[in-house]
């Protein structure tokens, strides 16, 4: 992981200096991501700087643009390695996060990681298009996030039924 000072500077650059207080948990996330990525393909970007800038900072940018209410429920569609939902949960511990992914092995990674990081989160093993049609999940979330899931038209069809 990049140094604490570099992380503080990065968080200041994206206008979210409060996230810098979670440096230790972001560092643990980075280490675990790199270790798990050797066993299963979670991401192509695994170098310390790339993880900090392209994964963590990019995932946190929406928090600087949208005011989510305290305690908002967030579904992270196609969670994969946890981006953007887990960095958002680290920066905003009041968010109620559900990770939705079609592959159980990714959810296993996220379940173990969220436990290590002390982040309460729900895991939903499903395809987004199916979850959106399920009464248990349809219109149950305040906000949906996704990253590298589908083109915008398809992504809207996956996410809109959930919020």
Label for each model-derived stretch:
Residues 2-70, 75, 105-108, 112-120:
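Class I SAM-dependent transferase core
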Residues 17, 69, 92-95, 147:
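Residue-level signal for short amphipathic helical patches enriched in basic/charged
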Residues 41-44, 50, 55, 82-85, ...:
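Residue-level preference for alpha-helix termini and adjacent loops
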Residues 78:
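Conserved glycine-centered beta->alpha loop in an early N-terminal alpha/beta scaffold
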Residues 81-94:
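Conserved SAM-binding loop of SAM-dependent methyltransferases across substrates and taxa
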Residues 94-98, 102-163:
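S-adenosylmethionine
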């Amino acid at each position: 992981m990049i140094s604490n000072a570099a992380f503080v500077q990065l968080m200041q650059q994206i206008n979210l200096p409060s996230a810098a207080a979670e440096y230790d948990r972001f560092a643990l996330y980075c280490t675990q991501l790199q270790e798990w990525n050797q066993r299963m393909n979670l991401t192509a970007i695994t170098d310390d700087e790339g993880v900090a800038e392209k994964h963590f900072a990019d995932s946190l940018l929406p928090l600087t643009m949208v005011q989510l209410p305290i305690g908002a429920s967030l579904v992270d569609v196609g969670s994969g390695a946890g981006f953007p939902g887990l960095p958002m949960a680290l920066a905003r511990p009041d968010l109620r996060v559900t990770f939705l992914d079609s592959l159980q092995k990714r959810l296993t990674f996220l379940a173990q990681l969220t436990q290590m990081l002390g982040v309460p989160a729900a895991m939903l093993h499903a395809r987004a298009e199916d979850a959106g049609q399920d009464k248990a999940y349809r219109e149950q979330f305040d906000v949906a996030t996704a990253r590298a899931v589908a083109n915008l038209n398809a992504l809207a069809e996956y996410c809109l039924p959930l919020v």
